[in-house]
């Protein structure tokens, strides 16, 4: 609600900028167009209308706002839905109001119109389409891929008012009737029927003479005159009927010559359109071949890079395995030497311990009170503790080596598993695959 009730009603109006979709921009296959092409639309002006006005009411009054010449005769309203423009159906025009085309319901206060184009590429507009073109478009129907123009095409509004044209058509028709009558064959069943009726009437009136032979010659002459007058009257009636039926033919402009010329123009237009379509199809085929070649080259490059990356990864893993096996072979001999040295160390340790214990036994009778405080006993304890520490260190080193080896093997197994999964998905999808680059380094 406005705070100032005395403000004029024009403050409640909304201004909308009207745009036309240019020819060739609309995607008839998808029946939509992207909003990125809005900058190329043609401006038809702006309108100031009530936001409560529906599209159906605006269609009737759009010529008043923009002018008859600026408004197409047949057009469709478009509405921005997402990133594309969609066609507004006839039922939706009575429901949608103009406020939905202005902020805050829309990004911009703009109204988009799509002119309807006929099958010959002509845009229906009030300034360019004449009555004759509309009738020719309405009377031309397409059946099984060919254009058919019916014979009962009505004349344009300018033709009935032209007397010279009527005279010419009447003269052509009479000439045609005379030419048809000069032919030996009968062209019209109705005319032959009328001629037959005339002959039968003459025969009838001629046969009436036989029962009245006693009549005078004057009476016979009078009867002959009456018969001749009756035949003339019937002939005039037949001519009047034909003459009264002829003006109805004026309503049909598709005389043989006009029909042939119109069909020739239609066939020529169809040939031109067909040639254009064939050329466009050839261009599209060439572009498609070119794009397919580029696609094949790109696929080959991707496959080559994929193979190179795959070979690098496999080479790194193979080199690591080779190093591991080589070091394992070397360490086998070193482990044998180490075990021998450990056995020798154990022997030396046992000998030293035996010597110290023997010396301790010899020194016992002298110093029975201070056995625990003797140097020999302390040396024995130190030796045992040192031996235990050495064993713990060796065990710690072996456990550490096993742990490092297990971690490296697990990392390598995870990378191999991911590679196998990627190869499997690639085979299922049937498309070239670009493997992911792992951040972890190859174990050494």
Curated annotation (Swiss-Prot):
Tissue pattern of expression reads:
Highly abundant in the testis, and is also expressed in the heart and kidney (at protein level).
* Record keywords: Coiled coil, Cytoplasmic vesicle
Instruction: Identify the GO cellular component terms for this protein.
Output: acrosomal vesicle; cytoplasmic vesicle
Which InterPro entries would you find in this protein's record? SPAT1 (IPR039062), SPATA1_C (IPR031478)
Chief location bin: cytoplasm
Residues that span the membrane, as ranges = none
Give the residues annotated as coiled coil.
268-403
Keyword Cytoplasm appears in the UniProt entry: no
Question: Domain of life of the organism in this record?
Answer: Eukaryota
User: Where does the record say this protein resides?
Assistant: Cytoplasmic vesicle, Secretory vesicle, Acrosome
Describe its partners and assembly state. Answer: Interacts with IFT20.
- Any idea what this protein is called? Spermatogenesis-associated protein 1
Gene symbol? Spata1
């Amino acid at each position: 609600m406005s705070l100032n009730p005395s403000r004029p009603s024009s403050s409640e109006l909304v201004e909308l900028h009207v745009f036309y979709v240019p020819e060739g921009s609309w995607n008839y296959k998808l029946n939509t167009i992207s909003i990125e092409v809005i900058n190329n639309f043609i401006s038809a002006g702006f309108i100031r209308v009530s936001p409560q006005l529906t599209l159906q009411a605006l269609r009737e009054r759009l010529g008043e706002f923009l002018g008859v010449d600026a408004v197409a005769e047949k057009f469709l309203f478009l509405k921005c839905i997402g990133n594309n423009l969609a066609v507004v159906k006839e039922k939706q025009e009575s429901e949608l109001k103009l406020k939905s085309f202005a902020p805050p319901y829309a990004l911009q206060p703009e109204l988009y119109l799509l002119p309807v184009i006929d099958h010959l590429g002509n845009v229906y507009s009030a300034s360019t389409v004449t009555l004759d073109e509309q009738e020719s478009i309405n009377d031309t129907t397409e059946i099984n891929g060919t254009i058919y123009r019916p014979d009962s095409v009505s004349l344009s509004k300018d033709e009935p008012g032209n007397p010279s044209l009527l005279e010419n058509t009447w003269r052509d028709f009479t000439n045609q009737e005379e030419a048809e009558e000069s032919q030996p064959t009968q062209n019209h069943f109705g005319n032959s029927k009328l001629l037959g009726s005339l002959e039968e009437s003459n025969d009838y009136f001629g046969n009436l003479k036989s029962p009245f032979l006693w009549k005078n010659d004057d009476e016979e002459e009078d009867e002959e005159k009456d018969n001749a007058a009756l035949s003339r009257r019937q002939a005039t009636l037949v001519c009047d009927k034909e003459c009264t039926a002829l003006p109805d033919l004026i309503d049909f402009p598709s005389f043989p010559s006009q029909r042939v010329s119109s069909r020739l123009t239609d066939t020529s237009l169809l040939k031109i359109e067909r040639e254009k379509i064939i050329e466009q199809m050839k261009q599209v085929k060439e572009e498609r071949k070119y794009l397919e070649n580029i696609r094949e080259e790109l696929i080959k490059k991707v496959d080559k890079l994929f193979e190179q990356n795959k070979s690098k990864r496999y080479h790194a893993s193979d080199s690591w395995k080779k190093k591991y096996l080589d070091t394992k072979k070397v360490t086998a001999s070193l482990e044998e030497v180490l075990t021998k040295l450990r056995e020798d160390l154990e022997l030396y340790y046992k000998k030293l311990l035996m010597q110290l214990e023997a010396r301790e036994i010899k020194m016992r009778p002298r110093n029975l009170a201070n056995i625990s405080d003797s140097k020999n006993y302390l040396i024995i304890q130190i030796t045992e503790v040192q031996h235990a520490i050495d064993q713990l260190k060796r065990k710690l080193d072996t456990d550490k080596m096993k742990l490092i080896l297990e971690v490296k093997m697990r990392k390598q197994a995870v990378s191999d598993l991911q590679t196998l999964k990627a190869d499997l998905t690639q085979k299922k999808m049937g498309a070239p695959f670009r493997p992911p680059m792992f951040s972890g380094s190859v174990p050494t």
